[in-house]
Amino acid sequence: MSCLPALDKFLQNYHQAYLTTLGELPRYYPQGEPSVCIQGEFFADSDKPIAWQPVKRDEVGSFTNVEHALDLPLWPDIHLFYGQYFSAPLLFDSKWGTGELLQVWNDDDFKCLQQNVIGHLMMKKKLKQPPTWFIGLLDEGDKMLTINNSDGSVWIEIPGEEQSEQLSTSLTAFIEALSPRIAPPVKHEELPMPALDHPGIFANIKRMWQNLFGKG
């Protein structure tokens, strides 16, 4: 089953929750990065958060190049989860704790995502572990949320280790179990490592990539 209907509904509920509770759109620190998601004026040198809303992409993003580069078919949800929208990360509450779903802010962010998916999968191969790909973070970034590439199930994964706890049999069921979390925007630190120099999606997975790329 495609995860897109569940993602569509969560995005709708997410923005409605902010409008109902705060009377405004959610806010995000773009850190100088433009995006069609931005509502209102945008100044690249501003350090203030902006209002945003998700925008469906004119051309759906694809990970076919990643599949070809690694000679590895990816579970189809990856194209739908990351390729349909431009969006800021989505905060959530759940029975497993609080966390966020990663999304793509602009085209450059998507290219960085592809590169880092390759890096993650190469690390899994180096560690002789089954392939996975990440969708978000749990418990303030201490745990990764990853997809088992063989069956599409959702798991908790500690960087450098194998998946440890299954949360859901599918990405659809996982997203359907989440509730939007209303919270003020958080300004993420820029990372010094070359693989992490993009201030969009990867500033949100600092702990993960410090662990993975620090192994060399």
From Swiss-Prot:
Keywords, A to Z, come to:
Cell inner membrane, Cell membrane, Membrane
In the bilayer, the protein is annotated as: Peripheral membrane protein
- Protein origin, superkingdom: Bacteria
Which compartments is it annotated to reside in?
Cell inner membrane
CC per GO annotation: cytoplasmic side of plasma membrane
Q: Does the keyword 4Fe-4S apply?
A: no
Q: Does the keyword Cell inner membrane apply?
A: yes
Q: Which family does it belong to?
A: Belongs to the Syd family.
What this chain does, per the record? Answer: Interacts with the SecY protein in vivo. May bind preferentially to an uncomplexed state of SecY, thus functioning either as a chelating agent for excess SecY in the cell or as a regulatory factor that negatively controls the translocase function.
| NCBIfam families tied to this protein | PRK04968.1
- What is the protein named? Protein Syd
Organism of origin: Shewanella sp. (strain W3-18-1)
